[in-house]
């Protein structure tokens, strides 16, 4: 008879997207509906699917949720969010992408069952920490401001560093 081991939990992996625009000195922020943190604000994003590159996930999720086409998508940073009392542990890969203004440059609520409206919000004016979805409070608590930080060393990096990656 095999000994009973406690279940092994693994963190989820999501991609969040800091959507910017040459027409706005802001970032797209939406009001979340759902089972976890039902009244919180979030960036566009979602689960990374098997074999998907980070850039592809950022493009797909932003289109599915906010009906925006992106260009110049690149890695920004990673946030490890763990909240024991909620049994919540996600690694969020944050990508930064600019709205492609050759398409409609304004966000639309493409998933009204999951999200409220999407709005352009200055980074400094994001909602209070307790109203932000998990990865955002981690960034804000660390004083991170992706609009002021030098991420030039990451431009062009799309997460293709793994063995056997697609090009």
Task: Go through each PLM region and give its residues.
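Active-site segment of metal-dependent pyrophosphate-handling enzymes
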Residues: 67-104
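Nudix hydrolase/Nudix homology domain
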Residues: 36-38, 104-167
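Acidic, metal-coordinating catalytic segment for phosphate/diphosphate chemistry
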Residues: 1-16
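Hydrophobic pocket-lining residues within nucleotide cofactor-binding pockets
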Residues: 48, 70, 79, 99, ...
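Short, well-ordered beta-strand micro-motif
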Residues: 19, 94-98, 119-122
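Structural detector for helix-capping/boundary residues
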Residues: 46, 60, 73, 121-124
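Short hydrophobic/aromatic beta-strand or adjacent loop that forms the aromatic wall/cage
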Residues: 12-16, 90-94, 115
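Conserved Nudix-box catalytic region and its N-terminal flanking loop in Nudix hydrolases
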Residues: 23-65
